[in-house]
């Protein structure tokens, strides 16, 4: 994420400080447009996020299309870890769900680690494919 603000790392650190049950902190933003729902390059987060709250526990992440009327949260691939959680995560082999979706955070969920996500206003530009790279070059 070439244009990520340091505030994003701070938001992860704040979430770890605020939520004692949180092993791994990450960020989400509301979907940018309806095409995000079916775009496999956009990782979607399913959250236990009570109405009016700005952070909650992540239940699942997927590249697949999400259906329904609820909000679609676009995952921002920035993480903050508690030391013990990072050590356990790094020592574990890739999990079945991780291999299926090609999403490393699913290994943590399968291990029983809690991932919490804070909502941010807008996802920074991510470079995940050649079109994203061209967009980043145009902004640089």
Give names to the regions the model predicted.
Residues 1-3, 124:
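A short, conserved beta-strand element in the Rossmann-like catalytic core
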Residues 4-95:
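Conserved core of the sugar-phosphate nucleotidyltransferase
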Residues 72-140:
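Conserved alpha/beta core of the MobA/IspD/sugar-nucleotide pyrophosphorylase nucleotidyltransferase superfamily
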């Amino acid at each position: 994420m070439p244009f990520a603000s340091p505030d994003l790392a701070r938001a992860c650190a704040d979430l770890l400080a605020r939520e004692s049950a949180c092993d791994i902190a990450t960020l989400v933003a509301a979907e940018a447009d309806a095409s995000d729902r079916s775009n496999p390059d956009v990782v979607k987060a399913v959250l236990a996020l009570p109405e009016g709250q700005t952070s909650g526990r992540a239940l699942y992440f997927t590249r697949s299309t999400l259906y329904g009327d609820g909000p679609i949260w676009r995952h921002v691939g920035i993480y903050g870890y508690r030391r013990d959680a990072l050590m356990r995560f790094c020592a574990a082999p890739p999990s079945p769900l991780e291999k299926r979706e090609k999403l490393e955070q699913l290994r943590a969920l399968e291990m029983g680690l809690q991932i919490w996500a804070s909502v941010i206003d807008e996802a920074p530009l991510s470079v995940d494919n050649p079109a994203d790279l061209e967009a980043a070059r145009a902004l640089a």
